[in-house]
Amino acid sequence: MSELKFSNRILRRFTETVAVELGADQFRVMVTLAKLPVEWTKPDTFNKMNAVESAQAYAQLQSAMRSHFGRGARGVLLRVGARLWNHLLEDAALGGRAQAAVIKRLPLAARRKQTLELLAKFIAGASGDVTVHSLDLDLLLVDHASPAADGQREASPICFITQGLIRESLYWATGASYDVEETACKAQGHHACEFKIVTGK
C-alpha cells in the first residue's frame, strides 16, 4: 500500500454510520471475524490516528464489509455512503458551508458540477486527489487516491461508499436521482477510480 492520506474525522463519521446501519452488535461481530482491532467499533478511537493510518483503516473496514456481506455488501455500502453525505455537510468548515449555500441558489443545471467539486474537496486527502470533469453532457469524478481501493484486488469496482456519496450529494443539490457508474477502479489495476454521472438526456 502507498502512503495515501484520509481524514480521521471522515473515518470516524464512516464508522458511526456503519454502526447505525448494521447495529452495534453486528458491527462488532464483523470486526471480530475480520480480525481487526475491536476498539475500531468505537468511533472515538480514530481521533488518535494520523492521516495515513486512517486511509489504511478505511480500506480495511470496507474490505471486511465486502467479505462479511458478500453480494449484499454493495447495497449496505451504498446506503452508508448516502448517509455519510449529510455528516460531511454538518462537519464542513465555514468555507464549505458557504459553498453549499451558494450551490443551492444556483440554477439546477449549474448545481451538479459545483456539488461534485464540493464533494471532491470534502473527501480529498490532498489537493488534486479528487477531480471533476465534463464529458459532453455527462460528468466524471476521478478519485486519483481512492484509499478504499488502495492495495485491494478485485475483478469488479468496489468503491460503493463514493458512489453513494455522489448519488446523495446530487440528490441534495437538485432533488433528482442520477445514474452513477464506477467505470474504472484501482482495485482492478487502474490508476484511478472513475465515476461517470449520466446527466444528459
What are these regions (language model features)?
Residues R112-Q114, A176-D179:
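Short Pro/Gly-enriched beta-strand edge/turn motifs at strand-loop
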Residues D143-A145:
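Residues forming anionic-ligand binding surfaces in small-molecule and nucleic-acid pockets
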Residues M1-D138, P147-P157, K186-A192, K201:
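N-terminal accessory segment detector
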Residues F160-A176:
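Active-site helix/loop of acyl-thioester processing domains in fatty-acid/polyketide metabolism
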Residues Y171, S177-K201:
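C-terminal, beta-strand-rich globular interaction domains
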Residues C159-Q163, V198-K201:
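Short, low-complexity, polar/charged sequence segments that are solvent-exposed and flexible
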